[in-house]
Structures are given as structure tokens and as C-alpha cells.
């Protein structure tokens, strides 16, 4: 009887070990039969979150202009875009005051702006622009504090200003709202930095336009969270040279898209790659 009890006890232990050990042997993310592979990292915050839908309500602000009629002085800027003509933004751009710029997270957002409540200087119609620069506060001034907090202000390119107001107005009251960005072609990824500090400028982003979260994946790595450096330049110190790269991008409205195999294994610095799809 004791022998039978021992045999039953041993079989019971073996069953427990099989239940406990076998799943562990597959490791994190392994596939069992037709099971779906677990993700490399936790989902990005706000992914496809309908509560973060674009706020398209109209708000009050002011607008001025900077640069010349050809866009002089509007190129480069605090969003990191560089040559706005080459990158597809052209003259339909504006620098935002501190209250709107949001430490660069608003770079790439699109707005519709119209001149209001000043019939002497306002022109009918509206303009649609992309945020590409920052209008810094000037705390030494006591008047004309257009870009100082908490003022909401758009410093438009001259070409855009002249579509909604007369030149001599200088500054006009406006109404503005966020609108979806309509861009041609795929999202663009421009490489900068060095092997130990990869920086990627992401531009030509449709939909909400402004990016809140970025991950990169080499063909030998999982998803790696990138840090916002300045404007829409995103960085990682993980060495990824020699690997093909994919990107996961989340815009401010919570929508996320995966851009697979954007860069081949032999990518280099100072190159621009087309993500082929857009928001």
C-alpha cells in the first residue's frame, strides 16, 4: 500500500512540474501553436485613444508676420525642419507663442486662421498653416507683448499674413482652430547624429501632425523608446548601425502607426527615407 501511495505521489509531482515548467521554457513572446506573439514592449501611452481626438473648436488669438515675401527668415527654426520648401511646407507656416508651442510638441500641427473684428485691416477668408517655429517671449518689453505668456499668438510668414490682413495692420486679432494636416506622400525620416547618438527628424506628418511618442526597432532588437531632443528630433543612444530600422509613431490625438522597414541595413547619416504611409 505504501508503494502505491509513493507512486501516486510521484506522478502528482510530475504533473505539477509539467504545468509549471513547460510554459516557462518558451520565454517571453514565444509562439505556441497559433498563439499570437507577445509585444516587445508595453503599448505606447494613448495609442488609438478616442478621448484624445483633435480639438477643432475656434479660439481667439493675435497674428503678426516675420520674414519677407519669399519666406526669408522663416526657414530652419525651433522645430528642426530645415528647408521648408524642400520638406513640403513652403510658405504656409507660422511660429507659435509659448502658450501654443508646448516645448516643441506642437511642431507639425496644422491650423486654420482668419482675421476678425477689425474691418479696417482684415481681409475675407482664411489660411491653413503648419507650426514650424517658435516665437520667443521678450520680457524686457512693456508693450506689444505678443508672444509672451499667456498670449496665444501666431507669427505668420508674410505671404500668409497678406492673405488675411493688410500689410500696414502689423498685428490683427484672429480666430484659429486645429485642423487635420493634409500631406502628400509618406511620413519622412531624416537621420542625423552619429553611431552612438542617433537622431531622427520626423516630418511631413498628416492627421494631427504633431508627434507625442516615437519608438524605433532594429531587425535585431525589440521596440526602443526614443526621447524628444528638440522640435521634432527624436533620439536614442542605442547603437543601431548595420540594422534595418522600423518606426512606431504616435500623434497627439492618440493614433499610432507602424512604419516597417523604413531604412535598409546600409542606411547612413544625413539621409532621408520615405515611410510610404501617412496618418
From Swiss-Prot:
Species in which this protein is naturally found: Arabidopsis thaliana (Mouse-ear cress)
Keyword Oxidoreductase among record annotations: no
Its annotated compartments are:
Secreted, Cell wall; Membrane
Q: Which CDD domains match?
A: DPBB_EXPA_N
Protein name, UniProt field: Expansin-A22
Q: Which UniProt keywords apply?
A: Cell wall, Cell wall biogenesis/degradation, Membrane, Secreted, Signal
Report any one BP term from Gene Ontology.
plant-type cell wall loosening
Give the record's family classification: Belongs to the expansin family. Expansin A subfamily.
Pfam families given in the database record: DPBB_1, Expansin_C
Q: Where is the Expansin-like CBD domain?
A: 196-275
Q: Which GO terms describe its cellular component?
A: extracellular region; membrane
Domain called Expansin-like EG45: residue spans: 76-186
Q: Where is the signal peptide?
A: 1-27
Q: Which gene encodes it?
A: EXPA22
Keyword Signal annotated = yes
